[in-house]
Regions:
Chain A
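Polyanion-binding surfaces on beta-sheet-dominated domains and ring/shell assemblies
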Residues: 1-288
Length: 288, 290
């Protein structure tokens, strides 16, 4: 990606045509939580995509998707699709960063066409913060002391963003890291939950996610958690919106229970990867 | 966060102190260091404040300007944050070193201000869909002595409290073009309601306990913590886990509960102090001489 770091581009005058959409009067008033809830979930507690509030979207995982990378993984969580590539351990690129423990460099990027509103091809502030969050979460899981003076690069590219990109990135990155044979304490499983005044929605889609623009109400928020199920440790925690501490406790419990259920799926994918790698090695030895 | 090198013995000393609820400087685990606050220092800014939390020094200036509102939100004004970690604060911020931290603080502030009804942005609208007030909140980190998130949030809240927004009247002319008239009286201004504006509380975990307002040495001993944005009504508007360690869900929940209690107290004391300063009137400014 050509990155021009010397010039500051002025603001673009182009804007999305969806702003010209005629909004009906009902939509204008439904900033209130009660109507928002009606929009997302009907009286029988079924969401727009026919899920129950505590149902997550179907998960698809595959490793070895980038042949040149040391390890890679692809995740599909409903319509959210992202790819993660892991390179390393290799020598630290910047000479000043010389540490006794290994270092992790994470890059989180939305493809320009991945979201409803076009993203710039350079990392903007939101992506930089998400990269930092991803790095801090993975640093808790990776055994950094196993590769001193070296660095591992984790690159996440979101191909389609339909809600919970950070949660999917956490799961995908830890799968990619483990398939790259980077020593880790535990797999990180990411999950997110949307809080509405009377119900919690697990694994929200983009439409269900809390938007800072729309909701100005109490008890409306979004929580993304990165959890290490075997060690029972939370390594990433991001909450946005207005909540009470009691609600936060409930949301955390829901998310950790979900992560425990997802862990065997990730482990199964990893097991199949290892079996395939061993089978390939066996074939190569036979060929020799 | 200048290069803090602690020996194992020093780290053990801090750990034991925290266990006994007696930190190196004599505080308990939930005590803040002394805070010095002064507002209205910068004459060219619509609102300003300087907050010194022990060794952390932050200067905030708020400038109000007229601009067109965002197309998605035609009836609201905006708040734009910018954090500048100057190289004066600590040698690590030299060049572009402080950019990451500045970006994180900026983004977290934006998130915590956008949630809920912390600040009523509809008040900042002048002419629906055409003109609105934009508050540029510029934060200068002059010195870094640990616990930047808290210092910055308290300074920003104080600066917004004292921000004067000029009154503008919309005069409709015969043609379609409405004209904006600025009030002739320079003291005819309005202020924002900052009652619900959140304060950030940082809690770092050391051993089995957590601390409020960590010093740089304590930050070095700790591997993880949370930053919680607590609004005036004791609600939590944003949370982020910081540091490269991990937390058990139960300790995380108890940290959140403590943070909301501490945040409520901090909010109350800050508002009280700001009211007192306002009542004291335009006495001699101490400024940077102290």
């Amino acid at each position: 990606m050509p990155v021009d770091s010397r010039r500051l581009q002025g603001p673009e005058s182009a804007f999305s045509y969806t702003l010209l959409e005629k909004k009906d009067a009902n939509a204008e008033e439904s900033i209130l939580s009660a109507d928002m809830q009606k929009m997302l979930i009907d009286s029988k507690q079924i969401r727009k995509d026919k899920r129950k509030p505590t149902d997550a979207r179907p998960l698809f995982l595959r490793t070895g998707i980038i042949s040149q990378a040391k390890g890679s993984a692809y995740i599909e969580q409903g319509n959210t699709k992202l790819v993660c590539g892991v390179y390393g351990p290799r020598e630290v690129q910047k000479k000043s960063d010389f540490r006794l423990n290994g270092q992790l460099f994470c890059e989180f990027k939305f493809a320009p066409f991945s979201c409803q509103k076009r993203r710039s091809h350079q990392q903007d502030n939101e992506e930089l913060v998400l990269s930092g969050l991803l790095r801090e979460a993975l640093e808790a899981a990776v055994c950094l002391h196993h590769f001193p003076k070296a660095q591992v690069e984790v690159n996440v590219m979101v191909i389609e963003n339909d809600g919970s990109p950070l949660a999917a990135a956490l799961t995908c990155a830890s799968l990619a890291l483990s398939s790259a044979s980077i020593p880790m304490y535990d797999l990180v499983v990411g999950a997110s939950v949307r809080q509405l005044p009377k119900v919690l929605l697990l694994d929200p889609t983009k439409d269900e996610e809390w938007q800072p623009e729309l909701s100005h109400d109490q008890n409306n928020s979004n929580l993304t958690v990165g959890y290490m199920p075997s060690m029972q440790q939370v390594c990433a925690y991001v909450h946005e919106g207005v909540s009470n501490t009691e609600d936060l406790e409930q949301m955390l419990k829901l998310v950790t229970e979900y992560c425990l259920k997802v862990q065997p799926i990730v482990q199964l994918c990893l097991k199949e990867t290892v079996e395939k790698m061993l089978a390939n090695e066996g074939e190569n030895k036979d060929a020799e | 966060m200048a290069e803090i090198l602690l020996s194992e013995a020093e780290k053990a000393f801090i750990h034991h102190g925290v266990q006994d609820d007696l930190r190196c400087d004599g505080r308990t685990r939930l005590d803040y260091r002394p805070i010095i606050l002064e507002t209205g220092l910068v004459s060219n800014a619509s609102g300003s404040s300087r907050l010194r939390l022990a060794n952390s020094d932050v200067l905030v200036g708020v400038k109000v300007e007229l601009a067109s509102p965002l197309p998605e939100k035609p009836l609201e004004g905006r708040l734009e944050f910018f954090v500048d970690c100057s190289a004066n604060a600590t040698p690590e911020f030299e060049g572009r070193g402080g950019e990451d931290l500045a970006n994180e603080i900026c983004r977290f502030l934006q998130m915590s201000y956008m949630s809920g009804d912390t600040i009523n942005l509809a008040e900042l609208s002048v002419l629906a869909g055409q003109q609105c007030w934009v508050l540029y909140v510029d934060i200068l980190i002059l010195e870094c002595g640990g616990n930047l998130y808290d210092t910055v949030s308290l300074a920003v809240k104080s600066a917004l409290y004292t921000t004067q927004i000029p009154s503008i009247k919309v005069a409709t002319m015969d043609g379609d073009q409405p004209e904006l008239e600025l009030s002739e009286d320079p003291y005819d201004t309005k202020r924002l309601n900052t009652q619900n504006v959140p304060c950030l509380v940082t809690l770092m975990k050391i051993g089995n306990h957590y601390l409020v307002d960590p010093t740089p040495e304590e930050e070095c001993c700790s591997s993880s913590g949370v930053v919680v944005a607590v609004s005036g009504t004791k609600k939590i508007t944003a949370v982020r886990k910081i540091g490269s360690g991990s937390l058990h869900p139960e300790s995380l929940v108890s940290m959140l509960k403590t943070a909301s209690e501490v945040g409520a107290v901090v909010n109350k004391i800050l508002m009280k102090t700001l009211l007192e300063e306002e009542r004291a009137g335009k006495t001699q400014k101490v400024g940077f001489m102290r």
